UniProtKB/Swiss-Prot annotation:
This is Ig lambda chain C region. It holds the Pfam family C1-set. The lineage of its organism: Eukaryota, Metazoa, Chordata, Craniata, Vertebrata. GO terms for cellular component: extracellular region; IgG immunoglobulin complex. One of its GO terms (biological process) is immunoglobulin mediated immune response. Residues 6-99 form the Ig-like domain. Keywords: Disulfide bond, Immunoglobulin domain. It comes from Gallus gallus (Chicken). Coiled coil: none annotated. The keyword Disulfide bond applies.
């Protein structure tokens, strides 16, 4: 089966969660990749954090999907600007970045 690089989608914390002003969760969805091993890092304003990443699951098209979550305090979220989900697959890093000011 040919190697396929993942598609990455990065979601900011929900407005509902931010309105509660206690925590902020970022979600990185990683879809349509093969083979299954992936590693995920989170980079916040240049510093690396580790999130919680699910084990890859096989999709109906025989490729894999996974997701990674980064939980922050609301004050942590509001004190940084650039949030990046960095996925390493098959020796290649793919990143998706969001800016808090644009959310």
């Amino acid at each position: 089966q040919p190697k396929v690089a993942p598609t990455i989608t990065l979601f900011p914390p929900s407005k509902e969660e931010l309105n509660e002003a206690t925590k902020a969760t970022l979600v990185c969805l990683i879809n349509d990749f093969y083979p299954s091993p992936v590693t995920v890092d989170w980079v916040i304003d240049g510093s690396t954090r580790s999130g919680e990443t699910t084990a890859p699951q096989r999709q109906s098209n025989s490729q894999y999907m996974a997701s990674s979550y980064l939980s922050l305090s609301a004050s942590d979220w509001s004190s940084h600007e650039t949030y990046t989900c960095r996925v390493t697959h098959n020796g290649t890093s793919i990143t998706k970045t969001l800016k808090r000011s644009e959310c």
